[in-house]
Protein backbone atom coordinates (compact mmCIF):
# COMPACT_ATOMS: atom_id res chain seq x y z
CA UNK A 1 0.00 0.00 0.00
CA UNK A 2 1.62 3.26 -1.12
CA UNK A 3 0.47 6.84 -0.79
CA UNK A 4 1.39 9.80 -3.02
CA UNK A 5 1.90 11.98 0.01
CA UNK A 6 3.97 10.14 2.61
CA UNK A 7 2.81 12.62 5.27
CA UNK A 8 -0.64 11.07 4.95
CA UNK A 9 0.66 8.18 7.04
CA UNK A 10 0.81 10.53 10.02
CA UNK A 11 -2.96 10.80 9.92
CA UNK A 12 -3.65 7.08 9.55
CA UNK A 13 -5.18 5.22 12.48
CA UNK A 14 -3.17 2.15 13.46
CA UNK A 15 -4.80 -0.91 15.00
CA UNK A 16 -3.00 -0.45 18.32
CA UNK A 17 -4.09 3.18 18.63
CA UNK A 18 -7.67 2.27 17.85
CA UNK A 19 -7.77 -0.47 20.50
CA UNK A 20 -6.25 1.91 23.04
CA UNK A 21 -8.89 4.52 22.22
CA UNK A 22 -11.58 1.92 22.98
CA UNK A 23 -10.19 1.42 26.48
CA UNK A 24 -9.06 -2.16 25.87
CA UNK A 25 -6.82 -3.69 28.51
CA UNK A 26 -3.12 -3.86 27.55
CA UNK A 27 -3.14 -7.67 27.53
CA UNK A 28 -6.17 -7.76 25.23
CA UNK A 29 -4.48 -5.31 22.88
CA UNK A 30 -1.34 -7.46 22.93
CA UNK A 31 -3.36 -10.60 22.14
CA UNK A 32 -5.32 -9.07 19.25
CA UNK A 33 -2.16 -7.57 17.77
CA UNK A 34 -0.24 -10.83 18.20
CA UNK A 35 -2.85 -12.89 16.37
CA UNK A 36 -3.46 -10.28 13.68
CA UNK A 37 0.25 -10.12 12.89
CA UNK A 38 0.24 -13.86 12.14
CA UNK A 39 -1.90 -13.22 9.07
CA UNK A 40 1.15 -12.16 7.08
CA UNK A 41 3.03 -15.47 7.57
CA UNK A 42 -0.23 -17.36 6.98
CA UNK A 43 -0.74 -15.57 3.69
CA UNK A 44 2.85 -16.26 2.65
CA UNK A 45 2.39 -19.97 3.47
CA UNK A 46 -0.34 -20.38 0.84
CA UNK A 47 2.24 -20.82 -1.91
CA UNK A 48 3.75 -23.96 -0.36
CA UNK A 49 0.54 -25.50 1.03
CA UNK A 50 -1.86 -25.96 -1.87
CA UNK A 51 -2.81 -29.61 -1.43
CA UNK A 52 -5.17 -31.62 0.76
CA UNK A 53 -4.01 -33.80 3.63
CA UNK A 54 -5.29 -37.38 3.90
CA UNK A 55 -6.79 -36.56 7.29
CA UNK A 56 -10.12 -35.35 8.68
CA UNK A 57 -10.59 -32.57 11.21
CA UNK A 58 -12.68 -32.87 14.37
CA UNK A 59 -15.85 -32.20 12.35
CA UNK A 60 -15.12 -35.00 9.88
CA UNK A 61 -14.09 -32.67 7.05
CA UNK A 62 -11.12 -33.27 4.77
CA UNK A 63 -8.22 -31.06 5.85
CA UNK A 64 -6.24 -28.89 3.47
CA UNK A 65 -2.52 -28.50 4.16
CA UNK A 66 -3.18 -24.86 4.98
CA UNK A 67 -5.80 -25.83 7.58
CA UNK A 68 -3.15 -27.79 9.43
CA UNK A 69 -0.38 -25.24 8.91
CA UNK A 70 -2.45 -22.27 10.10
CA UNK A 71 -3.85 -24.22 13.05
CA UNK A 72 -0.45 -25.42 14.29
CA UNK A 73 1.13 -22.00 13.76
CA UNK A 74 -1.54 -20.13 15.72
CA UNK A 75 -1.60 -22.69 18.55
CA UNK A 76 2.18 -22.40 18.92
CA UNK A 77 2.20 -18.60 18.91
CA UNK A 78 -0.75 -18.28 21.29
CA UNK A 79 0.59 -20.97 23.62
CA UNK A 80 3.95 -19.24 23.95
CA UNK A 81 2.40 -15.82 24.57
CA UNK A 82 1.12 -16.45 28.10
CA UNK A 83 -2.01 -14.48 27.15
CA UNK A 84 -4.51 -17.33 26.70
CA UNK A 85 -5.72 -19.84 29.28
CA UNK A 86 -7.89 -21.97 27.01
CA UNK A 87 -8.15 -22.40 23.25
CA UNK A 88 -10.68 -24.24 21.07
CA UNK A 89 -9.99 -24.71 17.37
CA UNK A 90 -12.21 -26.10 14.65
CA UNK A 91 -9.29 -28.33 13.65
CA UNK A 92 -8.77 -29.84 17.12
CA UNK A 93 -10.89 -32.53 18.75
CA UNK A 94 -10.18 -31.29 22.27
CA UNK A 95 -9.96 -27.96 24.06
CA UNK A 96 -6.35 -26.94 24.69
CA UNK A 97 -5.37 -25.48 28.07
CA UNK A 98 -2.22 -23.46 28.64
CA UNK A 99 -1.35 -23.83 32.31
CA UNK A 100 1.49 -21.31 32.01
CA UNK A 101 -0.85 -18.48 31.03
CA UNK A 102 -0.72 -15.33 33.14
CA UNK A 103 -4.13 -14.21 31.78
CA UNK A 104 -7.65 -15.61 31.85
CA UNK A 105 -8.52 -14.90 28.22
CA UNK A 106 -9.78 -17.81 26.20
CA UNK A 107 -9.92 -18.05 22.44
CA UNK A 108 -11.99 -19.81 19.78
CA UNK A 109 -10.87 -19.95 16.17
CA UNK A 110 -11.39 -21.27 12.71
CA UNK A 111 -7.77 -21.06 11.51
CA UNK A 112 -8.72 -21.02 7.84
CA UNK A 113 -12.34 -20.71 6.82
CA UNK A 114 -13.11 -21.62 3.21
CA UNK A 115 -9.92 -23.61 2.70
CA UNK A 116 -11.56 -25.69 -0.05
CA UNK A 117 -11.30 -22.54 -2.19
CA UNK A 118 -7.51 -22.25 -1.96
CA UNK A 119 -6.94 -24.23 -5.15
CA UNK A 120 -9.25 -21.83 -7.03
CA UNK A 121 -7.58 -18.72 -5.53
CA UNK A 122 -10.83 -17.37 -4.10
CA UNK A 123 -11.02 -15.43 -0.85
CA UNK A 124 -10.57 -17.31 2.43
CA UNK A 125 -10.11 -16.09 5.98
CA UNK A 126 -9.35 -16.64 9.65
CA UNK A 127 -12.03 -16.23 12.37
CA UNK A 128 -11.22 -15.51 16.03
CA UNK A 129 -13.29 -14.89 19.15
CA UNK A 130 -11.91 -13.89 22.55
CA UNK A 131 -13.67 -14.39 25.89
CA UNK A 132 -12.73 -13.50 29.44
CA UNK A 133 -12.90 -15.76 32.51
CA UNK A 134 -10.87 -18.67 31.17
CA UNK A 135 -13.51 -20.88 29.52
CA UNK A 136 -14.68 -21.19 25.91
CA UNK A 137 -18.18 -22.57 26.56
CA UNK A 138 -19.83 -19.16 26.76
CA UNK A 139 -22.59 -17.58 24.65
CA UNK A 140 -21.53 -15.25 21.86
CA UNK A 141 -23.06 -12.30 23.70
CA UNK A 142 -20.21 -12.63 26.23
CA UNK A 143 -17.44 -12.16 23.66
CA UNK A 144 -14.88 -9.55 24.68
CA UNK A 145 -13.64 -9.23 21.10
CA UNK A 146 -14.12 -10.86 17.73
CA UNK A 147 -12.34 -10.40 14.44
CA UNK A 148 -11.71 -12.02 11.11
CA UNK A 149 -9.09 -11.63 8.44
CA UNK A 150 -10.07 -11.81 4.78
CA UNK A 151 -7.31 -12.76 2.36
CA UNK A 152 -8.30 -11.04 -0.88
CA UNK A 153 -6.64 -8.33 -2.99
CA UNK A 154 -5.92 -6.78 0.42
CA UNK A 155 -5.35 -8.56 3.71
CA UNK A 156 -8.23 -7.02 5.64
CA UNK A 157 -8.82 -7.31 9.39
CA UNK A 158 -12.39 -6.65 10.58
CA UNK A 159 -12.62 -6.23 14.34
CA UNK A 160 -15.09 -5.44 17.09
CA UNK A 161 -14.39 -4.96 20.78
CA UNK A 162 -18.02 -4.18 21.52
CA UNK A 163 -17.87 -0.61 20.24
CA UNK A 164 -18.93 -0.97 16.63
CA UNK A 165 -17.01 -2.54 13.76
CA UNK A 166 -13.90 -1.28 12.00
CA UNK A 167 -11.72 -2.68 9.22
CA UNK A 168 -7.96 -2.38 8.83
CA UNK A 169 -5.73 -3.24 5.88
CA UNK A 170 -2.29 -4.78 6.31
CA UNK A 171 0.39 -2.53 4.87
CA UNK A 172 3.44 -4.72 4.13
CA UNK A 173 5.64 -1.64 3.70
CA UNK A 174 5.10 -0.28 7.20
CA UNK A 175 4.10 -3.68 8.67
CA UNK A 176 1.08 -2.12 10.35
CA UNK A 177 -2.68 -2.46 10.06
CA UNK A 178 -4.08 0.88 8.85
CA UNK A 179 -7.71 1.90 9.29
CA UNK A 180 -9.64 1.15 6.11
CA UNK A 181 -13.24 1.84 7.17
CA UNK A 182 -14.66 3.18 10.41
CA UNK A 183 -18.03 2.25 11.90
CA UNK A 184 -19.69 -0.24 9.57
CA UNK A 185 -23.49 -0.24 9.41
CA UNK A 186 -25.12 -3.19 7.65
CA UNK A 187 -27.50 -1.82 4.99
CA UNK A 188 -30.81 -3.45 4.07
CA UNK A 189 -29.55 -5.04 0.86
CA UNK A 190 -31.43 -7.43 -1.42
CA UNK A 191 -28.98 -10.25 -2.01
CA UNK A 192 -28.67 -13.68 -0.46
CA UNK A 193 -26.46 -16.73 -0.39
CA UNK A 194 -27.49 -20.12 0.88
CA UNK A 195 -25.63 -23.36 1.46
CA UNK A 196 -26.94 -26.89 1.63
CA UNK A 197 -28.75 -29.19 -0.80
CA UNK A 198 -32.15 -27.97 -2.00
CA UNK A 199 -33.91 -31.33 -1.89
CA UNK A 200 -32.88 -31.70 1.78
CA UNK A 201 -34.13 -28.27 2.90
CA UNK A 202 -36.89 -28.13 5.49
CA UNK A 203 -40.18 -26.31 4.89
CA UNK A 204 -39.31 -23.08 6.77
CA UNK A 205 -36.16 -22.59 4.71
CA UNK A 206 -37.98 -23.33 1.47
CA UNK A 207 -40.45 -20.58 2.41
CA UNK A 208 -37.58 -18.20 3.17
CA UNK A 209 -36.02 -18.80 -0.25
CA UNK A 210 -39.43 -18.43 -1.88
CA UNK A 211 -39.75 -15.02 -0.21
CA UNK A 212 -36.33 -13.96 -1.50
CA UNK A 213 -37.11 -15.06 -5.05
CA UNK A 214 -40.51 -13.35 -5.06
CA UNK A 215 -39.03 -10.09 -3.80
CA UNK A 216 -36.21 -9.65 -6.28
CA UNK A 217 -33.23 -10.78 -4.21
CA UNK A 218 -30.06 -11.61 -6.15
CA UNK A 219 -27.93 -14.67 -5.38
CA UNK A 220 -24.40 -13.99 -4.11
CA UNK A 221 -22.50 -16.98 -2.73
CA UNK A 222 -18.79 -17.80 -2.68
CA UNK A 223 -18.54 -20.83 -0.39
CA UNK A 224 -16.43 -18.99 2.17
CA UNK A 225 -18.37 -17.89 5.27
CA UNK A 226 -15.89 -15.08 5.94
CA UNK A 227 -16.10 -13.74 2.38
CA UNK A 228 -19.89 -13.94 2.28
CA UNK A 229 -20.20 -12.20 5.65
CA UNK A 230 -17.84 -9.46 4.55
CA UNK A 231 -19.94 -8.94 1.45
CA UNK A 232 -23.14 -8.49 3.46
CA UNK A 233 -21.31 -6.24 5.93
CA UNK A 234 -20.59 -3.93 2.99
CA UNK A 235 -23.69 -4.38 0.82
CA UNK A 236 -26.31 -5.81 3.16
CA UNK A 237 -28.48 -8.84 2.52
CA UNK A 238 -28.41 -12.28 4.07
CA UNK A 239 -26.26 -15.38 4.23
CA UNK A 240 -27.63 -18.68 5.45
CA UNK A 241 -26.70 -22.29 5.98
CA UNK A 242 -29.90 -23.92 7.25
CA UNK A 243 -30.69 -27.13 9.03
CA UNK A 244 -31.77 -29.98 6.77
CA UNK A 245 -33.34 -33.42 6.90
CA UNK A 246 -29.92 -35.06 7.22
CA UNK A 247 -28.35 -32.33 9.38
CA UNK A 248 -31.05 -30.58 11.44
CA UNK A 249 -28.38 -28.58 13.29
CA UNK A 250 -26.83 -27.30 10.08
CA UNK A 251 -23.13 -27.17 9.27
CA UNK A 252 -21.57 -24.18 11.01
CA UNK A 253 -19.92 -24.49 14.40
CA UNK A 254 -21.45 -22.28 17.05
CA UNK A 255 -18.16 -21.39 18.76
CA UNK A 256 -15.75 -21.07 15.85
CA UNK A 257 -17.90 -19.49 13.15
CA UNK A 258 -21.42 -18.41 14.13
CA UNK A 259 -20.63 -16.58 17.37
CA UNK A 260 -17.62 -14.47 16.27
CA UNK A 261 -19.18 -13.49 12.93
CA UNK A 262 -22.59 -13.00 14.53
CA UNK A 263 -21.05 -10.73 17.15
CA UNK A 264 -19.41 -8.60 14.46
CA UNK A 265 -22.53 -8.34 12.29
CA UNK A 266 -24.66 -7.50 15.34
CA UNK A 267 -22.21 -4.77 16.35
CA UNK A 268 -22.70 -3.33 12.86
CA UNK A 269 -26.49 -3.22 13.29
CA UNK A 270 -27.32 -6.58 11.72
CA UNK A 271 -28.52 -9.77 13.37
CA UNK A 272 -27.95 -13.52 13.53
CA UNK A 273 -30.58 -16.20 14.19
CA UNK A 274 -31.22 -19.91 13.81
CA UNK A 275 -34.70 -19.00 12.60
CA UNK A 276 -36.28 -18.88 16.03
CA UNK A 277 -33.77 -17.33 18.43
CA UNK A 278 -30.74 -15.08 18.60
CA UNK A 279 -27.74 -17.37 18.19
CA UNK A 280 -25.61 -15.15 20.44
CA UNK A 281 -27.83 -16.13 23.39
CA UNK A 282 -27.25 -19.89 23.02
CA UNK A 283 -25.19 -21.39 25.85
CA UNK A 284 -22.89 -23.98 24.22
CA UNK A 285 -23.03 -27.52 25.58
CA UNK A 286 -19.95 -28.72 23.67
CA UNK A 287 -17.26 -26.96 21.72
CA UNK A 288 -18.02 -28.54 18.33
CA UNK A 289 -21.75 -27.82 18.62
CA UNK A 290 -23.42 -26.86 15.34
CA UNK A 291 -26.29 -24.52 14.55
CA UNK A 292 -28.40 -23.44 11.58
CA UNK A 293 -27.45 -19.88 10.61
CA UNK A 294 -29.20 -16.87 9.13
CA UNK A 295 -27.01 -13.77 9.33
CA UNK A 296 -27.37 -10.33 7.82
CA UNK A 297 -29.53 -7.22 7.65
CA UNK A 298 -31.82 -6.66 10.62
CA UNK A 299 -35.03 -6.27 8.63
CA UNK A 300 -34.44 -9.45 6.65
CA UNK A 301 -33.69 -11.46 9.80
CA UNK A 302 -36.93 -10.20 11.34
CA UNK A 303 -38.81 -11.37 8.24
CA UNK A 304 -37.17 -14.80 8.43
CA UNK A 305 -38.15 -15.19 12.08
CA UNK A 306 -41.70 -14.18 11.14
CA UNK A 307 -41.78 -16.91 8.47
CA UNK A 308 -40.55 -19.51 10.97
CA UNK A 309 -43.04 -18.38 13.61
CA UNK A 310 -46.00 -18.67 11.24
CA UNK A 311 -45.26 -22.27 10.25
From Swiss-Prot:
Binds 2 magnesium ions per subunit. It is an enzyme of class 3 (hydrolase). Pfam families: FBPase, FBPase_C. Keywords: Carbohydrate metabolism, Cytoplasm, Hydrolase, Magnesium, Metal-binding. Mg(2+) 2 binds at residues 110, 113, 257. Substrate binds at residues 113-116, 221, 251. Its cofactor is Mg(2+). Gene3D superfamilies: 3.40.190.80, Fructose-1,6-Bisphosphatase, subunit A, domain 1. One of its GO terms (cellular component) is cytoplasm. Its main location: cytoplasm. It catalyses: beta-D-fructose 1,6-bisphosphate + H2O = beta-D-fructose 6-phosphate + phosphate. Its EC number is 3.1.3.11. The keyword Membrane does not apply. GO terms for molecular function: fructose 1,6-bisphosphate 1-phosphatase activity; magnesium ion binding. Pathway: Carbohydrate biosynthesis; gluconeogenesis. Signal peptide: none annotated. Belongs to the FBPase class 1 family. Homotetramer. PANTHER family: FRUCTOSE-1,6-BISPHOSPHATASE-RELATED, SEDOHEPTULOSE-1,7-BISPHOSPHATASE, CHLOROPLASTIC. HAMAP family: FBPase_class1. This is Fructose-1,6-bisphosphatase class 1. It comes from Methanospirillum hungatei JF-1 (strain ATCC 27890 / DSM 864 / NBRC 100397 / JF-1).
